[in-house]
A protein has these predicted regions:
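Active-site proximal beta-strand in glycosyltransferases
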Residues: 40-45, 81-83, 95-122, 139-141, ...
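Conserved catalytic-core segment of nucleotide-activated headgroup transferases in glycan assembly
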Residues: 41, 149-152, 160-222
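Membrane-proximal helix-turn-helix segments that form the acceptor-binding/catalytic region
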Residues: 70-76, 108, 116-139, 146-147
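Short alpha-helical segment that forms part of, or immediately flanks, the ligand-binding pocket
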Residues: 226, 248-256, 269, 275
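Acidic donor-binding loop of glycosyltransferase active sites
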Residues: 230-244, 259
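Short hydrophobic beta-strand element within catalytic cores of glycosyltransferases
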Residues: 256-263
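Conserved acidic donor-binding segment of nucleotide-sugar-dependent glycosyltransferases
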Residues: 273-284, 292-297
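A charged, aromatic-enriched C-terminal amphipathic alpha-helix characteristic of glycosyltransferases
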Residues: 284, 295-337, 342-345, 351
Length: 357
């Protein structure tokens, strides 16, 4: 696997600590760039739609290299911490002798819904709690909404977005934008029937990996994605409050660019109705709001500026860096309290949720 060029120069200027990171959602992994650690990112994982790094979503972090799981397991590097995203990752890394943490990116209910699983959610929570306590692991949730779903609310670390990474809003293209992967398998979670009723016949651009949807493609790269965000009039996010949060990283990116957001009402939505976007559970009303923004670029720009302020206040990359560095130190302390070695567990000891793959 390739090592990113220029790493030696970066190593001379930064920390020598290295994290072992299972690949997950590339935009989330990319923000680890802010930590200024070296990153060994494990690719070629079972169940992930692509075998390498998805450069259509993000470039590789500056101090990162890509490795396979076998290489990671036999690496002589003393990793400062292992970053996992599901129980499969935890068990795959069970032979490694370093501290570890798992990041919860989804609600338990959402994963069960998407995977059509018959597992008892209470049993799943109990087993994960028991496992991390025994092996001295640490759990980080990306929002309180997701942490409460799993019963882990002690360490909430919101993702970070640097608003300065995004070009200023134009909105010259009178169309809505939605970025989403694998819509067909997540229709209920995304309230897709509601989305279709609200926006059918209106100019809306869908972006993402959706091989069963003709004409829908992922961005060419991050710069192309930024250009699309800059050009479109507003952004769309709909989600079932039982399964999914009222925002995601793409929503925050859109807000950072200065797009107002349109969607259903959700207790966790960062959108303030009538200020930074429009929210409604009535598809006809939401459609009317969309038409207002399509016809009034000035209003869209004004509301988008409020959306941008919200992102800068709530999803600062500096705050993410501070919080996640703290999470790593907590994981290192907990590792010293482990009761059993992770290697004592087998593949049959935990039910699996391939949360990000």
């Amino acid at each position: 696997m390739p090592i990113i060029m220029g790493m030696d120069k970066q190593e001379a200027n930064g920390t020598d600590k290295t994290l072992l990171v299972f690949n997950c959602h590339e935009p989330w992994v990319y923000q680890l760039n802010a930590l200024d650690y070296k990153l060994d990112i494990i690719v070629g994982l079972r169940g992930k739609y692509n075998k390498g790094w998805d450069y259509q979503m993000r470039p590789l972090p500056t101090r990162a290299r890509l490795i396979g799981l076998p290489e990671a397991l036999r690496s002589p590097t003393e990793y400062y911490c292992i970053i996992a995203h599901n129980t499969t990752d935890l068990l795959d890394a069970r032979s490694r002798p370093e501290p570890r943490l798992i990041v919860l990116h989804h609600t338990l209910e959402g994963r069960i819904q998407e995977e059509h699983s018959s597992i008892d959610p209470d049993k799943m929570k109990e087993m994960l709690h028991t496992y991390v306590e025994l092996v001295g692991g640490h759990v980080v949730a990306t929002s309180m909404f997701k942490g409460e779903s799993w019963g882990f609310t002690d360490d909430i670390v919101h993702f970070g977005v640097d608003a300065d990474d995004y070009p200023p809003y134009s909105g010259h293209e009178a169309a809505g934008l939605r970025i989403c992967n694998f819509i067909s398998s997540r229709r209920q979670i995304l309230l897709w029937d509601f989305h279709e009723r609200a926006f059918e016949g209106l100019p809306v651009t869908l972006v993402g990996h959706n091989p069963d949807m003709p004409g829908v493609e992922a961005s060419r790269d991050w710069n192309h994605l930024k250009q699309m965000l800059q050009a479109h009039r507003f952004y769309i996010h709909t989600a079932d409050p039982r399964f999914e949060a009222g925002y995601n990283m793409a929503t925050a990116e859109a807000m950072a660019t200065g797009l107002p957001v349109i969607g259903n009402r959700h207790p966790t939505s960062p959108v303030k109705h009538g200020v930074s976007g429009f929210l409604s559970d009535n598809p006809k009303e939401l459609r009317r709001f969309a038409k207002v923004l399509l016809e009034d670029r000035g209003l869209a720009r004004m509301m988008g500026q409020q959306a941008r302020k919200t992102v800068m206040e709530r999803f600062s990359l500096a705050c993410f860096k501070h919080a996640f560095l703290r999470s790593i130190e907590i994981a290192r302390r907990k590792w010293r309290t482990r009761k059993v070695a992770p290697s004592s567990f087998t593949i049959d000891d935990l039910p699996f949720t391939n949360c990000c793959r």
